[in-house]
C-alpha cells in the first residue's frame, strides 16, 4: 500500500462561476489559475501522483505549457490516473477536504463524489469529499481564496 498527500490553493479573482470537484458552482468571484482552477481535483491529482511516486501535477501538466491553458481538471485527473494504473496500482480510497469560507460546498459534494468516482473508475464508497471553513481566520477565512487537501491510498494490483 502507498499513501499520497496533495495540496492546492487558488486566489479569488475575476468573475465566477468556480469549478470545484468538477462541479460548476455559481459564485460572484472566479479563481485565478492557468487551468480551470479546480483546487479539489488538483489536490487529488497530486495525492494520487505522490502515492505512485510520479511527481506532481505541475511536473505532468506544467503551467508554462500553453496546451494546459484553461484545461479541464477532470481530463488531467483521468490522464494522471491512466499513468498510475500503467504502473500497476489500483485505488484503495481517496479523501478530499475543501477549505473555504464561501461559497457553501455542502450542496455540491454529492456530485463531486460522482464525478471523482467516474474519473477514477471506482465505487463512490471509495471517494470521500468534505468541506470546512477556517472560522474566518487566514486567507480562506478572509475570502481571499480556496484551499484543498487530499489523501489517496493506492494498492499494488495483483498480476
From Swiss-Prot:
Metal-binding keyword on record:
yes
State the top-level EC class. lyase
Q: Which Pfam families match?
A: YgbB
Keyword tags: Isoprene biosynthesis, Lyase, Metal-binding
- Binding-site residues for a divalent metal cation, renumbered to this chain: 8, 10, 42
Domain of life, per the record?
A: Bacteria
Spans through the membrane: none
What does the record give as the reaction this protein catalyses?
4-CDP-2-C-methyl-D-erythritol 2-phosphate = 2-C-methyl-D-erythritol 2,4-cyclic diphosphate + CMP
The pathway entry for this protein reads as: Isoprenoid biosynthesis; isopentenyl diphosphate biosynthesis via DXP pathway; isopentenyl diphosphate from 1-deoxy-D-xylulose 5-phosphate: step 4/6
Q: How is the cofactor bound?
A: Binds 1 divalent metal cation per subunit.
Please name the NCBIfam families in this protein's record: ispF
Quaternary state and interactors: Homotrimer.
- From the Swiss-Prot or TrEMBL record, give the protein name: 2-C-methyl-D-erythritol 2,4-cyclodiphosphate synthase
- Gene name for this UniProt entry: ispF
Amino acid at each position: 500500500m502507498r499513501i499520497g498527500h496533495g495540496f492546492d490553493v487558488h486566489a479569488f479573482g475575476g468573475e465566477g462561476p468556480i469549478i470545484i470537484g468538477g462541479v460548476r458552482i455559481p459564485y460572484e468571484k472566479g479563481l485565478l489559475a492557468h487551468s480551470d482552477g479546480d483546487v479539489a481535483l488538483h489536490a487529488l491529482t497530486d495525492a494520487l501522483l505522490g502515492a505512485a511516486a510520479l511527481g506532481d501535477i505541475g511536473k505532468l501538466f506544467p503551467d508554462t505549457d500553453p496546451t494546459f491553458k484553461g484545461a479541464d481538471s477532470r481530463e488531467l485527473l483521468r490522464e494522471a490516473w491512466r499513468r498510475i494504473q500503467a504502473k500497476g496500482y489500483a485505488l484503495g480510497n481517496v479523501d478530499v477536504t475543501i477549505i473555504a469560507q464561501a461559497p457553501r460546498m455542502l450542496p455540491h459534494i454529492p456530485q463531486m463524489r460522482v464525478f471523482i468516482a467516474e474519473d477514477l473508475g471506482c465505487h463512490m464508497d471509495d471517494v470521500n469529499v468534505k468541506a470546512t471553513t477556517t472560522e474566518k481566520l487566514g486567507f480562506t477565512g478572509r475570502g481571499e481564496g480556496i484551499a484543498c487537501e487530499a489523501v489517496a491510498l493506492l494498492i499494488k494490483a495483483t498480476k
